């Protein structure tokens, strides 16, 4: 009897462990949260690498690494030096670095993209590296073609594919050393009926050459279509099951604007797609920006692919046939006790090294307010991070003593130059105060002040939910919630553009340099989703 009971217990434990194992073999979308649009992916052996767009933010084009397609680690940026990433003058949320493509060939990584609107930019470029973490080469400028170029190495040739802004796709063969064309660009295909054909990728799979591209604009009608030919130069026939990827006919789905995909094949022969998408709050407004999603790809008997379930990206899928590899979590708090900033920190356009320092006051990030503020397409004294979760807290301890009323420093929730919420320390009528200032559509619509002690450190905190930001201060003998603000008013549907919200630290003299620096002792960033 005892033996039978033990045997039954072991069976039950085994079944429980099997169920746990099965439960663990799923993943949830999105796989990279916060503003990470236009993902492009490649596999090198057992490793996967992925790059996304950054627009006016610097450093440009983050490079992520994964072992299992689900868990990703930021390892570097393809454009990490101001001289190879000219962003000054580019428009907020619509200029800068567009839609890169990442490929690997014969020991070298290639990233091709477009710098749109930056002073000194020459349009389309590519950079190379032996190690995807860097260093990356200086740009090889290709020319002022349209945005969203792609490359693919097939049968020893480097094919270059790009939209032409007239609804067609141009294909040529490029010298990888010089960026010159050894086979001239020619029109090989057109879009398949949707607006704004863009983001094409070129593949040879089996006997066919495929052009997979996005259509429908960047909004809720975004979708992915595919066409193929036996020759790279055409003629191309469209898939009978287009679009191969879109959530546009599922208005109640939590994911929308799905598209701009890239394909990758695993060692086991299975195919997967990474793509961009948004998560609108209550189905209406999204402020995190376009994020990166993952879905399986199936091929029918005629050689046509379909992404997800009937072309729809779902919240949960079975895990890829790969061992799970979870990276060590990044610390919630940055104490600024290292010699360099972490890879997650981001600037607006090309920063001046003179406005920030980790060495002038060791153990602190020192920001020096310049004459530049958030209203121009210049580079203000700002260092921030993507808002990577709906629910989070961002807080910092800062010591800042303004001398005149134009001087300020604090935290900011930034959608773009004309739409941001500032939680700041400044001076009013000879008194140091904390203030929340809401700027929407380039107009200050609301301010609230609270007096502070004349000296001493202040803790500034922002708490985010799906619909609201709450702004709080703490100092000696002072603790107050200064107010709240709506996430809707900084959403893409309201302010436009292609980016998402960033939260960070800043300082400004609003027309002249600050007398005193702002010393940030630490910054906490706690994602709670």
UniProtKB/Swiss-Prot annotation:
Q: What is its EC number?
A: 3.2.1.55
An MF annotation (GO) of this entry: alpha-L-arabinofuranosidase activity
Where located?
A: Periplasm
Residues of the signal sequence? 1-23
The keyword Hydrolase appears for this protein: yes
Metabolic or biological pathway, per its Swiss-Prot or TrEMBL entry: Glucan metabolism; xyloglucan degradation
Q: Which residues form the active site?
A: 38, 198
pH relationship of activity? Optimum pH is 6.0-7.0.
Cite the CDD domains for this sequence: GH43_XynB-like
InterPro entries (UniProt xref): ConA-like_dom_sf, GH43_C2, Glyco_hydro_43, Glyco_hydro_beta-prop_sf, Glycosyl_Hydrlase_43
Domain of life assignment: Bacteria
Positions of the record's site feature: Important for catalytic activity, responsible for pKa modulation of the active site Glu and correct orientation of both the proton donor and substrate: 148
The alphabetical list of record keywords is:
Carbohydrate metabolism, Glycosidase, Hydrolase, Periplasm, Polysaccharide degradation, Signal
Picking any one GO biological process from the record gives: xyloglucan catabolic process
Which reaction equation describes what this protein catalyses? Hydrolysis of terminal non-reducing alpha-L-arabinofuranoside residues in alpha-L-arabinosides
- SUPFAM superfamilies per the record? Arabinanase/levansucrase/invertase (SSF75005), Concanavalin A-like lectins/glucanases (SSF49899)
**Would you tell me the Gene Ontology cellular component terms?**
periplasmic space
Q: Tell me one Pfam family matched here.
A: GH43_C2
Q: Does the keyword Calcium apply?
A: no
Additional free-text comment from the UniProt record: Gut bacteria supply the human body with energy from dietary polysaccharides through glycosidases that are absent in the human genome. Xyloglucans are a ubiquitous family of highly branched plant cell wall polysaccharides present in the vegetables we consume. Enzymes involved in xyloglucan degradation mediate the conversion of otherwise indigestible plant polysaccharides to short-chain fatty acids.
Family named by the database record: Belongs to the glycosyl hydrolase 43 family.
Task: Name the job this protein performs.
Answer: Alpha-L-arabinofuranosidase involved in xyloglucan degradation by mediating the cleavage of terminal non-reducing alpha-L-arabinofuranoside residues in xyloglucan branches, converting the 'S' units to 'X' units.
Protein known as: Non-reducing end alpha-L-arabinofuranosidase BoGH43B
Q: What is the protein's species of origin?
A: Bacteroides ovatus (strain ATCC 8483 / DSM 1896 / JCM 5824 / BCRC 10623 / CCUG 4943 / NCTC 11153)
